[in-house]
């Protein structure tokens, strides 16, 4: 499976798709309000992670922070320079059952 040319979905694409889904349900909501909700959602996700909260969407997946140990003599791939990396946290996503099942049979 080649991952170099996968289609990319942007936040604008998500806003447009939500807008289409709402129009198909015969409701009206302007894109600017949908964008506000999507922006607020991602901001809340980020803020919750920064507070070291675990964010769980049942059957979809869980976002959490994981601690990475620091290393000595890590190499900067752009410059080749050796640097020390302190302990730090990274965002981690663990997919839920429905998401795993949904993507299991995708052929690439």
From Swiss-Prot:
Keyword Amino-acid biosynthesis attached: no
Classification via InterPro entries: Hist_DNA-bd, Histone-like_DNA-bd_CS, IHF-like_DNA-bd_dom_sf
Keyword Ligase on entry: no
GO MF annotation, one: structural constituent of chromatin
UniProtKB keywords: DNA condensation, DNA-binding
SUPFAM superfamilies to which the protein is assigned, alphabetical: IHF-like DNA-binding proteins
SMART domains reported in the protein's UniProt record: BHL
One annotated GO biological process: chromosome condensation
One GO cellular component term: cytosol
Pfam family, one: Bac_DNA_binding
Function: Histone-like DNA-binding protein which is capable of wrapping DNA to stabilize it, and thus to prevent its denaturation under extreme environmental conditions.
Family membership noted in the UniProt record: Belongs to the bacterial histone-like protein family.
Protein name: DNA-binding protein HBbu
Biological source species: Borrelia parkeri
